Structures are given as C-alpha cells and as structure tokens.
C-alpha cells in the first residue's frame, strides 16, 4: 500500500473515531437531558420538516405540544402498549420472542417484512435517528435503547413516546393528535379514540385517523379487545405507568 493511501486511510479512521465520540457525547447528553426535560422536537420531526422544504412544501409544519403523563388519558398509554408492545413493563428494551417470530416470518415472506420493535426501540429511533432500514441504524438503535432503558423509568419512556409518535401528516404527539382529530385535549380521550390513534401507528402516513379504512377499524377493534384482556386501567396502575 502506498504512503498516500495509508495517509488517506489514517485520516478517514481518525475522522470516523472522532465522529463516533461526538455522536456518543451528543446522544448521551440527550438521554440525560430528556430524562427530566420536555422534548422540543425529535429527529423524525426534523427529517419530515426538511424533506417538505426540499420538495417545495413550505406550508408543512411538524407540530407537537408536550404534555406530561398526568395530562394524557390512561386509555392512550394502554392502547399503544396493547397495540405495539404488550411486554413493555417487563423487558429491558427488546422482546426476544417477537424478534425471533419476525425473523422467521421475514424469511418466509421476503416481500412482507414484519417488524418487532418495542416501544423503547421506537422511542430511541424517533428521538435520535433517521428513518429507514439499515444494519448501521439498527445497531445505533440498539445502543440508544439500552441507554434510555438504563437511565429512564418505564413511565418516562412511555411519556416521551406518546409525545413524539407520528399520528399523521405533520401531527406529532398525542396532544396534537387529540386536538386535530377529536378537538379535545389528550386527557379527555376515550378508550375508543385512544384505540383508533394507536391503530394507525404502524404507518400513520398511509393509515388515516380522519378517514379510517376497514383495516384500521378492524385493528382498532382488536386493540380494544387487547386492552380489555390486559386488564384495563388497573394495568397502568399496577405497573406505575399512569
């Protein structure tokens, strides 16, 4: 290998190492800060806003209103747990059984990829990372998930998740969603309304709260049944999530 190529390789290696250190400090600081402070915006919100501007859509506004857990209907927290991650109170960020099932399904159905991300993983991804699928992003997501599971309580993870989740075009967080779709604060959401909001979370840009498809309605009904089977509001109290 020539001296010039060695020099370039050495420069790139030093640059990447420094970048990793900077990102680690940035993300570590974010995890520490947002363990107590409201989250003003997420990486997904920034990505959506910048993408809209780049496409000439200057009317798009990524909107979110932070609210504490006691300003959110307990039905909403229960609905997303029932829909997205029923083992949320028990695991340390990863549902191994669900991951194994998803991998087996994806091997059989390459055109219909199934995910197995927990609420903790989705929170880490939405807050700190870019959208998309890659092993690099998945690796970073795993590290960030362990970080927030170590520093934050389960109640804090759920609070942040509900405040940054995307519920529609430009609609981020349960307070903005409740105001947009039901003209009421998040604290007043009913069990059925909470289940409908949770029903669009797999793909909120495809599935619409304002005009729910038959699939969304059937998923809403399934979520309502799961909420009942989990035990209703006492489930949230039992796990200190309310």
From Swiss-Prot:
The keyword Nucleotide-binding does not apply. Its main location: membrane. It is found in: Cell inner membrane. It is an enzyme of class 2 (transferase). Inhibited by EDTA. Stimulated by Ca(2+), Mn(2+) and Co(2+). Not inhibited by flavomycin. Its EC number is 2.4.99.28. The chain crosses the membrane at residues 19-39. It holds the Pfam family Transgly. Optimum pH is 6.0-6.5. Keywords: Cell inner membrane, Cell membrane, Cell shape, Cell wall biogenesis/degradation, Glycosyltransferase, Membrane, Peptidoglycan synthesis, Transferase, Transmembrane, Transmembrane helix. One of its GO terms (cellular component) is plasma membrane. GO terms for molecular function: pentosyltransferase activity; peptidoglycan glycosyltransferase activity. Belongs to the glycosyltransferase 51 family. Interacts with FtsI, FtsW and FtsN. This is Biosynthetic peptidoglycan transglycosylase. It comes from Escherichia coli (strain K12).
